[in-house]
UniProtKB/Swiss-Prot annotation:
Protein's UniProt name: ESX-1 secretion system ATPase EccB1
Parts of the chain on the Periplasmic side: 66-479
Extra remark beyond the main annotation: DNA conjugation in M.smegmatis is unidirectional with distinct donor and recipient strains; mc(2)155 is a donor strain while MKD8 is a recipient strain. Mutations in a donor strain that alter DNA transfer do not always alter DNA transfer in a recipient strain.
Pfam families, alphabetized: T7SS_ESX1_EccB
Amino acid sequence: MAGFRLTTKVQVSGWRFLLRRVEHAIVRRDTRMFDDPLQFYSRAVFAGVVVSVLICLGAALMAYFKPLGKQGSDQLLVDRTTNQLYVMLPGSNQLRPVYNLTSARLVLGNASNPVAVKSEELNRISKGQSIGIPGAPYATPTGTPASQWTLCDTVAKPDSSAPKVETSILIRTLAIDSGVGPIRADQGMLVSYEGANWLITEGGRHSIDLADRAVTSAVGIPVTAKPTPISQGLFNALPNRGPWQLPQIPAAGAPNSVGLPENLVIGSVFRTATESDPQHYVVLPDGVARVNNTTAAALRATNSYGLMQPPAVEASVVAKIPEQVYVSPLPDQPLDVLLRQDSPVLCWSWQREPGDQAPKTTVIAGRRLPLPASAIGTGIDQIGGDSTVYIEGGQFVRLQSPDPRVGESMYYIDPQGVRYGIANDDAAKNLGLAGPVNAPWQVVGLLVDGPVLSKEAALIEHDTLPADPNPRKVASGEG
């Protein structure tokens, strides 16, 4: 056997060394081989082969124990080809096409996601009629919970004979700056609704008779001021703070019987003489009453009883007279009446942060909607609600209905601004909704009303979907 050994192990080892040295010289341009990283190539190849074998083995095991495109025990399925949703009702061997994921989750009683199955697999299973809630949202995603809800009117061409009012609903954080902000205590805005005139202040709305110049001039309404219309929604949202008119004084014009000078008849106005900022009083049948400057001016404009100026009376004399109360709704000082030409936007905002005991309401006016620049142009022009909705994702809300017989109600508001009633807590849980936020009915009630989301409604069979009774053609240029 020794005669057939043409090479020795040392020769083979030397040949391999020289081969590696040549490779080293070609790759690294250095024959000294102080280190030899190329020796790890074979180890890397071996490791790669091992990993590939393990991956293939794992894929084979997954395909055996959990094959894709097979129904298995899943009850919520989706066709991988057509994306049609199906549910397998408990205790049934029929597949039911379902209109939307919302209905499927209500039927099954959980917020599971559909499993993709091949069409061939689905075609082997018996099928029943379609079920679900027509008009329900496909799903019920939620965004950042909104703590601020705002209703705005924007008047176009306020100087015209028929100004146009556009309503916007803002379910998002507002952007307040010098162009739009809360009405101050010394500001007001003149509006009209159904033929009546109202003055809007920071606290709400006050009915006012523009023909009563004694009151209007006292509160700062110019004779040229023109009221502009507001929407029904904004009118109802603004709280009614009562009329701005002077209470009648009994026996006005009759002589006083409280010891004042004869020229001060009942209903006349006088002032104290010793104070640096004179206090005005009105004479009543059984005494005198303090009034603010605006009320004093309105009373004198109504009837000054021949007095060019309010007479001055010693404070010591006034102190001996019984003091009564004259309830006047007029503000302490005249208002700065905002013109709709300069402030075409009027808003009512409701805000309740976590931990607040009660909501805070604000009246806002300005040149534009209180929206950040990034939100301009994101409004959804609703068909049935006559409003443009600006909303940051879906919202799950709980609110107190104005009808005490109804009590609390839960709603889901989808990203399109449509509200859907939630039947009960179980329905909300099955849809994956939790932690409802408070919201005002004054705003939520103006959104387009969708169907109630309940398990009973989702278990109704249909041959076909009903047609929308109020469709709208897509604007030209969009289709």
